[in-house]
Amino acid sequence: SKGHVRDLSTSGKFGLGVDIENHFKPKYTTIKGKKKVIDDLKKDVKKSDFVYLATDPDREGEAISWHLYDVLGLKPENYDRIVFHEITKNAVLDSFKHARKIDQDLVNSQEARRILDRIIGFRLSKLIQSKTDGKSAGRVQSVALKLIVDREREIEAFIPEEYWSVTAHFKEFDADLATYNHKKIEIHNEVEVNEVMEKLGNAFTIEKVDKKTKNKKSKAPFTTSTLQQLASNKLNMSAKKTMTIAQKLYEGIELEDETVGLITYMRTDSIRLSDEFIKNTYGFIKAKYGEDYIGYAKQAKKKDNVQDAHEGIRPTSINRTPESVRPYLSDDEFKLYRMIYYRALASLMADAKTDNTSVTLDNNNYQFKASGQVIIFDGYLKVYSDYEDTKESILPPLDTYQSKILVSNSITNEQHFTSPPARYTEAKLIKEMEELGIGRPSTYAKTIDNIRTR
């Protein structure tokens, strides 16, 4: 059907296609250009004994199946609904074993959202167009736009405040002034910083050295929103571009003599992985990196607004490495697939381990602090270091110093000013929308694109 075949009409009161006075009953009409699609499908149905509806495995897909059921005149006894989350031979064949009927609750959910979109969006858009140069408004779009406007007003109202930092420079590391008599110190101007500098000498006493071994856990597999956020931050891809490329990776790439779906369905709130994928990945990790690198699957914390009907976004086969499919992908397809692949792989690998050292130095009751981190077991970072900050900062073994006195090479100070809140990047706006429960994963890209273009 190539997507939706019907939508709300623009007839009736306010052109909503919704009978507000009759229990909000919707009136549907065929989408322009879809009459031929429907006619062709009707011919195919007449030649068939049984019909399988295999639209996308989400709310919109369920609604499309329902509309097709209606316009094609299907009967309960001559159709089934099948669902798969990856376009692979095994997944498609397995879906026939779990065939079901249309989930009317999902359909009703989609219909309610669409009606709300129309009631709010249509009427608000017309009001805005009559009063301003605005192009459109919407149930999700307008709230997201308010976030952007509120942030801009914060920036405009922001008044910078002066502050100063003081740093002691030693042969192998630097330490920053943190406290005075172990209470947080704030230096507001040049007069105050000069008073501090006058009291400091070059000799520092090692007051305390703390050493801890910490575990650094890998992140869960991608959801729609986390994929869009990291693609924006690391690959400089817009949400729209990310979803376009992900759609292609999901639908299939030509690999030699076959078309293969490389990733699972990319509109999802879930971080779950199938038992089969976990088992295969554990075997892959053991064979390639060793048993010490095997981790455990992430468990989601249940949120009220999360729909956990699917898996997280992952490669359809852990054996199909990014390097093995590189010749068949464009540069952007390769970059996105590589990020999805290694995120899923890393999520099932062992924690990284770091030795963390912090030192407190005293100079005339002023305490300076420095910290260092060394990776002692790379764990999941063996495959995921390109996407996380893994910079090491090494401190000398200060706890073994015979003398408790260190002499600095120099002590410097620097003027700073507080910064206004940053404007939203696409990644930060998506994160904020998700945390506030604004919109759905499937709407983020379109919402942001509308705001950007209109």
Predicted features along the sequence, with ranges:
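Intrinsically disordered, low-complexity regulatory segments
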Residues: 1-114, 120, 181, 409
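Long, highly charged, low-complexity internal segments
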Residues: 2-30, 137-251, 283-298, 302-304, ...
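C-terminal or mid-to-C-terminal helical accessory/interaction module adjacent to the motor/catalytic core
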Residues: 33, 39-40, 66, 87-170, ...
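Alpha-helical scaffold elements adjacent to nucleotide-binding pockets in ATP/GTP-utilizing enzyme cores
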Residues: 40, 44, 63-71, 91-95, ...
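Interdomain boundary/hinge elements
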Residues: 78-81, 105, 260-266, 355
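Short, conserved phosphate-binding/catalytic loop or strand-edge motifs used
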Residues: 85-90, 224-225, 245-254, 258-267, ...
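Accessory beta->alpha helical hairpin/"wing" motif in late/C-terminal subdomains of nucleic-acid enzymes
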Residues: 259-285, 446-454
